[in-house]
């Protein structure tokens, strides 16, 4: 089972724990947990992609979403995958800190979410990237509210580098 949204993937990987006391769902939930992988995790480990060179090498700042790095324990795989495009993939300073999205956190705790966003954007912009990449839709929305630097889902970049349209 492949997930291209880190929050959903984290939840599916946690089904075994969530349903551990449910006699009807326990075994099925455990199977789902064991089969679930983030799409970047799977692609990095299982496929040799044929990347097409571009006229320019880009600087990509990779934001590891909380649900990805803390929930799924997937951190280096998306960056390794992006590095195969022959671009410069940069880890954001203080990358372990939330961007302020956190599901509904940016709606329920707007002041703190804005402070986290400002800190994240400052750290991103210190790298002077051509664009930002992440695997979480909420983070894409949150970070795009604080910067003019384009932010793309990791799979959008990989699609472009395997012959798809420029995002």
Describe the role of every protein-language-model region.
Residues 1-167:
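Iron-sulfur cluster-binding electron-transfer modules in prokaryotic oxidoreductases
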